């Protein structure tokens, strides 16, 4: 009986959220037309797990191809996961190679997260304990950017980390806020992940319940909504077998105040990124006031 209740409750929740999501799509279409004004600028934000820091910085070929790809995409802000072997100085050197003069890292050991930008950034806080591989809080373009990478192996720890992030956002009253990174968790909107794994929805549901909006869901078709694994892993199957294993665990969320400014999103899961990392990058585009 409990299992049946859980299934029905989950279906109800999905239906409710799907209805809200459909309305958001319509609202953003209107916003897109409304915001073609001279006092606004369009920006692009990308989040990318770069797989062991390009083998602790030793894989020069991957670094070169990554740099070329970032230059082509020209994001205004780039969040990075798994900066293994990087110091902040090394991250600034990498960022400069693709046109970002500003960079920050949460720590200089383990699996750090970082942020690079075309425009000045201010580090507000670096949280370590209780936040997976860390939570980096930076101010860029008058918005609060939170970059994280949640626990990869323990769903209960992931849930606690998600709760800590929501508490941090609430206690600091971050109204114009973006949260991004490898969450190692699944969204209830991704129907290919069946209800046999309802417990894996807890992290993303926690963010949604706190009015954080999943922008890739709003703009990305079901059959393109996957960010892991790529073809770089030797153990990855091919063709349809690979597609059955692919899942979405990388996200960009925004708070209520920024939702209507978002006009597009993409998971860059094409051939250009098949062999740069084991994750595909995710990105959003939005309008903000000109500075």
Regions found by a protein language model. Name each.
Residues 80-154:
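Structured beta-strand-rich core segments of catalytic domains in phosphoester-bond hydrolases
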Residues 27-34, 126-127, 170-174, 188-291:
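Metal-dependent phosphoester-hydrolase catalytic domains
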Residues 62-66, 87-91, 158-165, 199-203:
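Stable alpha-helical elements in mature extracytoplasmic
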Residues 43-50, 66-88, 145, 165-194, ...:
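Active-site beta-strand/loop signature of hydrolases that rely on acidic residues for catalysis
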Residues 2, 6-9, 23-94, 290:
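N-terminal, active-site-proximal structural segment of metallo-dependent hydrolase catalytic domains
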Residues 10-21:
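Bacterial N-terminal signal peptides
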Residues 54-55, 148-158, 187-193:
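Surface-exposed cleft-lining segments at the edges of enzyme active sites
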Residues 52-58, 79-80, 155, 216, ...:
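Short, solvent-exposed loop/turn elements at domain surfaces
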